[in-house]
């Protein structure tokens, strides 16, 4: 079975910075794109997607008194290649998608509140625009003849760093973490 479709939803993202300099909060963004799915065996198949993902993080400088003293927003083109597994019948299915995720940074923007103390990474460009990680998630879908309507949540742990990580650099780790919740619509071709 071959399926093509569209997906869209919300993303919740943050960054792991080691050493930790400030408290960080999640940033809410959007994501969406197109998907292709091939079911080769009962209950198993492959799925590839091409998405645009908004990610980033917020920081609260201790003692600043504001909810956010710094914010970094990233826009990435995103390519997850997933093992697709499902259980259920021809009408209602539970789904599980797991696999690698490759992303490339399209743009980056920063906001630093006046009076905040600039830190090492404030104003620093992203050193590694190509990002890779592992994604996994699950959800449910409804099959109505050739049409599939679904809802899925995913977690991505990026294993690559945004900033250089040599001994002489500022950070040992600077990896993104992203949670997405998407609705999708697919059409079975054959």
Residue ranges and their predicted role:
Residues 18-22, 64-70, 119-126, 167-173:
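Extracellular loop and loop/strand-boundary signature of outer-membrane beta-barrel proteins
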Residues 112-120:
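Solvent-exposed loop segments that connect transmembrane elements
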Residues 2, 10, 14, 37-111, ...:
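Gram-negative (and chloroplast) outer-membrane scaffold detector with strong preference
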Residues 11-35, 163-165, 170-171:
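Surface-exposed strand-loop-strand hairpins of Gram-negative outer-membrane beta-barrel proteins
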Residues 2, 24-30, 73-79, 92, ...:
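Residues that define the transmembrane beta-barrel architecture of outer-membrane proteins
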Residues 49, 126, 131-190:
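Predominantly the C-terminal beta-signal and adjacent terminal strand-loop region
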């Amino acid at each position: 079975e071959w399926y093509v479709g569209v997906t869209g939803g919300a993303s919740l993202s943050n960054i792991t910075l080691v050493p930790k300099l400030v408290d960080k909060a999640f940033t809410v963004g959007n994501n969406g794109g197109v998907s292709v799915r091939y079911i080769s065996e009962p209950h198993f198949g492959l799925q590839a997607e091409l998405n645009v993902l908004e990610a980033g993080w917020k920081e609260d400088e201790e003692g600043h008194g504001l909810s956010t003293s710094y914010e970094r927003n990233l826009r990435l083109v995103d390519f997850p290649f997933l093992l697709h597994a499902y259980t259920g019948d021809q009408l209602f299915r539970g789904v599980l998608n797991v696999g690698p995720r490759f992303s490339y940074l399209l743009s980056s923007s920063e906001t630093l509140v006046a009076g905040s103390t600039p830190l090492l990474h404030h104003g620093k460009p992203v050193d590694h625009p190509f990002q890779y990680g592992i994604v996994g998630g699950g959800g449910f879908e409804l099959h109505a003849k050739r049409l599939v309507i679904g809802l899925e949540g995913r977690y991505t742990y990026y294993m690559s760093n945004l900033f250089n990580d040599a001994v002489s650099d500022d950070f040992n780790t600077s990896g993104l973490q992203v949670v997405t919740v998407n609705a999708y619509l697919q059409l079975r071709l054959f």
